[in-house]
Amino acid sequence: MMSAKDMVKVMIVMFAICFLAKSDGKPVKKRSVSEIQFMHNLGKHLSSMERVEWLRKKLQDVHNFVALGAPIAHRDGSSQRPLKKEDNVLVESYQKSLGEADKADVDVLTKAKSQ
């Protein structure tokens, strides 16, 4: 068994270790480089998935527009842009009603009609 003097020495050493190790209740372990890299990759993956979902929704809107039978003007040449400003008009019969349109559609429609 330990004597009282040895027990006091052990207690003083334990107190010194606890007092000098300034953890302040915070976790002592820091993140390793691999954990930081994993979190970075996860953030990039999530933002990439958000972009893919946005693109999928936009392509679905285009597909629905074409499926409605909207007239598509075919032009000679490789340019997809209208040759004249007058050629760039909205198709009146296939516009969304204001109840169905989202804010971006309303902004585009008001700007296009004011010109």
From Swiss-Prot:
Residue span of region Important for receptor binding: 51-69
Any GO BP annotation: positive regulation of glycogen biosynthetic process
InterPro entries: PTH (IPR003625), PTH/PTH-rel (IPR001415)
Signal peptide from the UniProt entry: 1-25
Chief location: secreted
Cellular component per GO, a single term: extracellular space
Keyword Signal attributed: yes
Subcellular location: Secreted
Keywords attached to this entry: Cleavage on pair of basic residues, Hormone, Secreted, Signal
Source taxon at top rank: Eukaryota
A molecular-function term among this protein's GO annotations: hormone activity
Propeptide boundaries: 26-31
Pfam families attached to this UniProt entry: Parathyroid
Subunit structure: Interacts with PTH1R (via N-terminal extracellular domain).
Its biological purpose: Parathyroid hormone elevates calcium level by dissolving the salts in bone and preventing their renal excretion. Acts by binding to its receptor, PTH1R, activating G protein-coupled receptor signaling. Stimulates [1-14C]-2-deoxy-D-glucose (2DG) transport and glycogen synthesis in osteoblastic cells.
Annotated family: Belongs to the parathyroid hormone family.
Record protein name field: Parathyroid hormone
